[in-house]
Amino acid sequence: MMRILVSNDDGVNAPGIKALTEALAEIATVMTVAPDRNCSGASNSLTLTNPLRINRLDNGYISVHGTPTDCVHLAIRELCDGEPDMVVSGINAGANMGDDTLYSGTVAAAMEGRFLGFPAVAISLNGKAFKHYHTAAVYARRIVQGLLAHPIASDQILNINVPDLPLDEIKGISVTRLGARHKAEGIVRTQDPAGREIFWLGPPGLEQDASEGTDFHAIAHGYVSITPLTVDLTAYRQLSILQNWVDKI
């Protein structure tokens, strides 16, 4: 039976990881290893200056006092009883589209799985009420089954976003590119109860590129978006341009 490692960035007690684990357990042996707290926005950070402590929970999950990337790295290198066949991260409470992917711990957990050599999927639920984790879980299971039956290139991570809609209202699956947001809104300056100055990061910016073909466009029109991502961040089209520039200086 296939073995799947599940992780997330919302924390081991988040409803999304429970829905995902239960859905995938119908088709695979699932090991769930996730942060012991919400680590949203952790990106690909690793814990290098402190030990990683784990807690084995009654439901079989393992919580880690570390980041999403820590969780996947530790699980694959030490905790898993044999290597997983796939790493699936989610279900995130909130979209991971466009520029969000640079900050996302959900995407980072999948990326660590891919970096260590395994097929990897990140799945997020777009919305504010988060009523329909079941919808995202059904699509996660469907896509994982598809990857088993029809494997794709191993150098990519599938970044999946699902509208927060009932299952029967989803219009289909759309293959997309990343859209883009405007820059984040301003910093919020305030005081704590002791009168000390504190700051909150402003909310993310609104969509800047939500044109047809983007993940933003697909979600807005009721489609599940799938965007292939790669670990290699090289801007290949700029190499010759940069070389010409270097030759002039």
From Swiss-Prot:
Cofactor note: Binds 1 divalent metal cation per subunit.
InterPro entries documented for this protein: SurE (IPR030048), SurE-like_Pase/nucleotidase (IPR002828), SurE-like_sf (IPR036523)
Residues involved in a divalent metal cation binding: D9, D10, S40, N92
GO MF term set: 3'-nucleotidase activity; 5'-nucleotidase activity; exopolyphosphatase activity; metal ion binding; nucleotide binding
GO CC terms in record: cytoplasm
EC class: hydrolase
Cofactor(s) the protein requires to work: a divalent metal cation
Reactions it catalyzes: a ribonucleoside 5'-phosphate + H2O = a ribonucleoside + phosphate
Entry similarity comment: Belongs to the SurE nucleotidase family.
NCBIfam families (UniProt xref): PRK00346.1-3 (NF001489), PRK00346.1-4 (NF001490), surE (TIGR00087)
Job of this protein: Nucleotidase that shows phosphatase activity on nucleoside 5'-monophosphates.
Name used for this protein in its record: 5'-nucleotidase SurE
Source organism (scientific name): Shewanella oneidensis (strain ATCC 700550 / JCM 31522 / CIP 106686 / LMG 19005 / NCIMB 14063 / MR-1)
The organism's taxonomic lineage, starting at the top: Bacteria, Pseudomonadati, Pseudomonadota, Gammaproteobacteria, Alteromonadales
